[in-house]
Curated annotation (Swiss-Prot):
GO terms for molecular function: leucyl-tRNA--protein transferase activity. Coiled coil: none annotated. The keyword Transferase applies. Gene3D superfamilies: Leucyl/phenylalanyl-tRNA-protein transferase, C-terminal domain, Leucyl/phenylalanyl-tRNA-protein transferase, N-terminal domain. It catalyses: N-terminal L-lysyl-[protein] + L-leucyl-tRNA(Leu) = N-terminal L-leucyl-L-lysyl-[protein] + tRNA(Leu) + H(+); N-terminal L-arginyl-[protein] + L-leucyl-tRNA(Leu) = N-terminal L-leucyl-L-arginyl-[protein] + tRNA(Leu) + H(+); L-phenylalanyl-tRNA(Phe) + an N-terminal L-alpha-aminoacyl-[protein] = an N-terminal L-phenylalanyl-L-alpha-aminoacyl-[protein] + tRNA(Phe). Keywords: Acyltransferase, Cytoplasm, Transferase. This is Leucyl/phenylalanyl-tRNA--protein transferase. It comes from Rhodopseudomonas palustris (strain BisA53). SUPFAM superfamilies: Acyl-CoA N-acyltransferases (Nat) (SSF55729). It is found in: Cytoplasm. Its EC number is 2.3.2.6. It comes from the Bacteria. GO terms for cellular component: cytoplasm. It is an enzyme of class 2 (transferase).
């Protein structure tokens, strides 16, 4: 389900948070489109935190600390990286107004970024919205192999450590399925979201201003509760 809003300049970060609490998020047709439209998918993408999968090859890359991973250090650069054309994704849904809104959410502590660096160059990352015990992954990018995957592993470790209950990916791609992403019907999603919004989580339970090693991130993921059957 979608609904177009031509008065996107009237939307505030606080209004955006209320939309997320209702299971709705904004997109744009293209970077040049001045308007937004609201989306509430019939089937919602999630990565169950207790079912997150890390391949052996990726685990070796994460453990090697070949990349330096930081948090909330270069938010604007990450959102710009996500908005830039990439192979297989020549266009973007991140227009100027979306950029402004999410920077606004970052400034009030409800949006976060994970940055991946190689030799002091930003080569990957992701950003998303934090509300209650829910984290809404918005977009990711990479300029080096596995950089966005490493960012996702570090994000999941941080969410687990911080007491999050829901990782919303909005949609499911083959890439996300390899990490355990699933689709759930809208009604089921709303039940999960409502439960996640009853309490608060701590994105900064792991330090924001100090590095977390790949080995530490993998240990946190390995220690998560066993999925219920």
């Amino acid at each position: 389900m979608t609904a177009r809003d031509s008065a996107s300049s009237d939307i505030t970060p606080e209004m955006l948070l209320r939309a997320y609490a209702c299971g709705i998020f904004p997109m744009a047709e293209s970077v040049d489109d001045p308007t937004l439209f609201w989306v509430e998918p019939e089937q919602r993408g999630l990565i169950p935190l207790d079912g997150f999968k890390v391949s052996s090859r990726l685990a070796r890359t994460v453990r090697s600390d070949a990349f330096t991973v930081t948090v909330d250090r270069a938010f604007k650069a990450v959102i710009d990286g996500c908005a830039a054309p990439q192979q297989g994704r020549e266009d973007t849904w991140i227009n100027r107004r979306i950029r402004e809104l999410y920077i606004g959410l970052f400034e009030i502590g409800h949006c976060h970024s994970v940055e991946v660096w190689q030799d002091d160059e930003l080569v990957g990352g992701l950003y998303g919205v934090s509300l209650g015990r829910a984290f809404f992954g918005e977009s990711m990018f990479h300029r080096a192999r596995d950089a966005s995957k490493v960012a996702l592993v570090h994000l999941v470790a941080r969410l687990l450590e911080g007491g999050y209950a829901l990782l919303d990916t909005q949609f499911v791609t083959d890439h996300l399925r390899s990490f355990g992403a699933v689709e759930v019907p809208r009604r089921r999603y709303r039940t999960l979201l409502d439960a996640a919004l009853k309490d608060d989580a701590r994105f900064d339970r792991l330090p924001i201003d100090a590095p977390v090693s790949g080995a530490q991130a993998l240990e946190i993921i390995a220690a998560r509760p066993t999925p219920k059957r």
